[in-house]
């Protein structure tokens, strides 16, 4: 599988979307935030492949973990 995120000014004014679709990446996180499942997301956005979702979540996980040294936590 190639790239999973596409940013093109001609597609939704440059909003990051799943490659090969017009489905914004944000939609996946909105679904997950409201307690919906990956399967529900995929049912509603049939152009997105499960592999794309998994790779995006793995990428996000790696980015958060690798950013631990530069993020500032304020527990005040």
PLM regions with names:
Residues 1-76:
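Small, basic N-terminal interaction modules of short regulatory proteins
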């Amino acid at each position: 599988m190639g790239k999973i995120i596409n940013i093109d000014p001609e597609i939704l004014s440059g909003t990051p979307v799943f490659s090969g679709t017009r489905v914004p990446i944000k939609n996946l996180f909105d679904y997950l935030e409201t307690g919906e499942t990956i399967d529900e997301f995929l049912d509603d956005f049939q152009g997105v492949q499960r592999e794309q979702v998994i790779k995006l979540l793995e990428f996000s996980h790696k980015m958060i973990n690798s950013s631990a040294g530069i993020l500032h936590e304020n527990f005040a």
